[in-house]
Design a protein with these regions (language model features):
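Acidic, glycine-enriched active-site microenvironments
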Residues: 1-202
Length: 202
């Protein structure tokens, strides 16, 4: 079985065009370069990224989807959905849903991500970080959130100069200064979009 899995992984990797693999490697390197000044532990290589998104159904059923990218490539066998029903559905509360997902993820054990990317901003990141701290799991992985710029009313701000996504880290009030259209931001957006399509398609 292990030999078969290894062979399948090798075939899958060989099917990825070299240009795509090189582009992903370049983007990963740029992500790595963007983090050290803001995150002390970011000196370790970022190879495995887990990204999570929340989907609500009428506020009574909630799913949290997780996709995994390793060395810039999707690892579909590691994709997971967590269904939250009844009281655990969190009544459409993203913060509570993400906190519950983080509890379950920590209980499931390794392999750990090098970076956990949350589809959300400061509030969502803080909700997940609280569970990490309560579980004495700080240092297992980096944590970041990706979200659209917002106006004063909380709506996605699409004015000129504010159309891109923003990357937030725990303990920082301001987003990372990533340029719109940069390789690193496009790469993280692609992973977030993959998580979004995965969870709403379940």
């Amino acid at each position: 079985m292990a030999v078969s899995n290894a062979r399948e992984a090798a075939v899958t990797k060989s099917e990825v065009p070299m240009s795509d693999r090189l582009a992903a490697a370049f983007a990963l390197d740029k992500v790595q370069s963007a983090l050290p000044g803001a995150v002390p532990m970011a000196s370790r290589p970022i190879r495995r990224i887990e990204c999570v998104d929340v989907s609500h159904t009428g506020g009574t059923s909630t799913r949290v989807g997780m996709v995994v990218f390793e060395d810039g490539q999707p690892q579909k066998s590691d994709y997971r959905t967590h269904a939250l029903e009844g009281e655990a559905a969190c009544n459409g509360d993203d913060y509570a849903a993400l906190a519950e997902w983080m509890r379950r993820r920590l209980e499931s054990g390794p392999p750990w991500a090098d970076l956990v990317l949350i589809d959300g901003g400061r509030g969502q990141v803080s909700a997940v970080q609280r569970i990490v701290r309560e579980s004495n799991a700080e240092g297992l992985f980096l944590l970041a959130g990706i979200t659209k710029a917002r106006d004063d009313m909380g709506r996605a701000d699409r004015r000129a100069g504010n159309v891109g996504d923003r990357i937030f880290l725990p303990g920082r009030s301001n987003p990372l200064p990533l340029r719109d259209g940069s390789a690193e931001l496009l790469f993280l957006q692609h992973i977030r979009d993959t998580a979004h399509h995965f969870v709403i398609g379940r």
